[in-house]
């Protein structure tokens, strides 16, 4: 429990359905949604600070700032949440004054967090909502009509309907989540949100090159650039951050729409909590002035522009808030640690698999491709054990993109036999998230699809030692983390309008 701070952020996964913190959050969101989009304290304006949907024509210097894939990812989002929290608190105070509610519920209100890793997995079948399900207040279309009400009779601003968009225009009609999200006992499996690897890092940010890759907690050093998905993800931004965005899907799976889903703010509150937890283990933030003195643009509860720097949001208990727990939901050590994700492919191409021109990924079952030529793959695998020719093997899935968010991350496997594509098993390579790689984001991230690279050197050695990597073609399997139901023969329209995640090619290269 945080000590000596004015506001304590609590875990929504441990709250009763309509805990006062969630009730008043819903009331404030509803009021903010009623404000004109030009009001800096409105729901629309605050969402546009993260990203601007194509339906919004207004412009502002604060819009579309969100840095991803660079070392400002954590301090920028921390400042973003802090000013948003103040706006919500002031809105709660406004509502309570109008309704003569005492004591003032805004006095101790703090933004909750969603600790999706709180419940660790068991071998028992999942028959009820876990901490990886959306908190109950976000799943219900209705909410109580008063702080102590028990009947759900009022429209709930925290709830978004599920929808499978049929086009970019249809996607942006109304905020929504991917089909199945609201009713899921777990939005994602534990392996996709386990923050153990991130929390275990000792370096905040590193410079990645073709020759070296140093895993880091935060994302790649970007100096003074507020990058958008152009550099390397840190472990925390990769898992759980990107995977949760992709798992909730809908507008949460889009950079331009994410902050318009009320669960966004609880997701990022948990990401911020994990940063505080990492710092509590005597890890250190960067001390470079280009990181400390970077200026961001936000608006406060009075609608006044504020331009704080990173150095104003440091520490375990930054500014005036702390967290209920810095130890719960910090993850558990995986049985097999997957390969590190690296920002770039290697230099010498050994084998490829082309999409001709693009390979669509199945939302229902594994998509398998073979790397060719097979003899080059076999030679490369064998050379891993030759001490005279040290080299790293880099597996890259090129030009990953989708039309609309698919509502699930994907798992990548190397030579996994049919029926053994388990992310806790030895063949698991890593994740592909389509957050930031969707065509619906338009010009916000106009650099095309992502390249996702993994250093599979140690994995190949481990598979060889265990006799699990025989000579012959290398097969890459890409599997939806949460397979979608297969549409029946009568659902031809559903098949035709389903998301179309895809990639351009796959390569195996050396460094």
Give short role names for the model-derived ranges:
Residues 1-511:
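C-terminal accessory segments of proteins
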